[in-house]
Amino acid sequence: MSRQVTRLLGSLRHSGGGCSGSSKVCSLTSLVQSRSFGTTPPPPAAVFVDKNTRVICQGITGKNGTFHTEQAIEYGTKMVAGVTPKKGGTEHLGLPVFNTVAEAKAETKANASVIYVPAPFAAAAIMEGLAAELDLIVCITEGIPQHDMVRVKAALNSQSKTRLIGPNCPGIIKPGECKIGIMPGYIHKPGKIGIVSRSGTLTYEAVFQTTAVGLGQSTCVGIGGDPFNGTNFVDCLEKFFVDPQTEGIVLIGEIGGTAEEDAAALIKENGTDKPVVAFIAGLTAPPGRRMGHAGAIVSGGKGTAQDKIKSLRDAGVKVVESPAKIGAAMFELFQERGLLK
């Protein structure tokens, strides 16, 4: 199996979207120079992002911001600017750098931001994006203090313009069009499956498997594993239900909280003719012990994997007991329903 994985990833790396990372066929400079700021913001995307999404990077001049902005540009994402206080008026990776998000938005008509800012300052960066009324903020930063995120959550709930994905998440990608975050772009393939996950690495596993069986992905959203996040399963499912490109849905959850139960309730109440496959991590986790993510903890007898699995199965979801079975389970459902073309 490992040899098959290596061969597939190698072929994807050489044939995938964007420029080749090793050959550097197209330089960052030429990619950036081909972008025009335009005069109006882009139209709304079907599932949060698409080829028209115009992205700024908060923390662009830092190590992580530099590396992942470079990767995003090579993939084809419309990165239009960066924001670093006191460095306004300079350039980095061929992009203009501004002191504030408001200045960057006004100049470039950006509608999305990705945040690579250290944890003590990340909440302030999110609040700055909210104040600028961006459509989307993707916060990658891990370890933001919970009391900071309580303030952010209150601010999010008091408005309806801006959506936050994260924090502590891999980001979001529409394969072949827009990559915002730290996921390896080359393993993705444009296709039919919408993926939403609390786990970054398990997202990559689901991506690999749906690519391997020839289904590909429509949009992949990593919502993060913190107790206080901006986007949940229900938000993503509602988008996937009405997105014509999404023909199947993969949901990857874990112990802690009630997000998976809420998703099951939505599926049961609204119904969907799209096949849904789920995996819940933490089946053998002991109560009261945090398992990786800050939100991955069973407390007060609630949030167990067993409860989540039962709720999802009662809603008609195919729940697999191993992440290695996600792709095969989805392929079988497509076969049973005559959805393969």
Curated annotation (Swiss-Prot):
The active site is at H293. CoA binds at T61, G62, K63, N64, K87, I140, T141, E142. It is found in: Mitochondrion. Keywords: Ligase, Mitochondrion, Nucleotide-binding, Transit peptide, Tricarboxylic acid cycle. Substrate binds at Y204. The keyword Transit peptide applies. Pfam families: CoA_binding (PF02629), Ligase_CoA (PF00549). Its EC number is 6.2.1.5. It catalyses: succinate + ATP + CoA = succinyl-CoA + ADP + phosphate. One of its GO terms (cellular component) is mitochondrion. Its main location: mitochondrion. Pathway: Carbohydrate metabolism; tricarboxylic acid cycle; succinate from succinyl-CoA (ligase route): step 1/1. GO terms for biological process: tricarboxylic acid cycle. Residues 1-37 form a transit peptide. GO terms for molecular function: copper ion binding; nucleotide binding; succinate-CoA ligase (ADP-forming) activity. SUPFAM superfamilies: NAD(P)-binding Rossmann-fold domains, Succinyl-CoA synthetase domains. Succinyl-CoA synthetase functions in the citric acid cycle (TCA), coupling the hydrolysis of succinyl-CoA to the synthesis of ATP and thus represents the only step of substrate-level phosphorylation in the TCA. The alpha subunit of the enzyme binds the substrates coenzyme A and phosphate, while succinate binding and nucleotide specificity is provided by the beta subunit. Belongs to the succinate/malate CoA ligase alpha subunit family. This is Succinate--CoA ligase [ADP-forming] subunit alpha-2, mitochondrial. It comes from Arabidopsis thaliana.
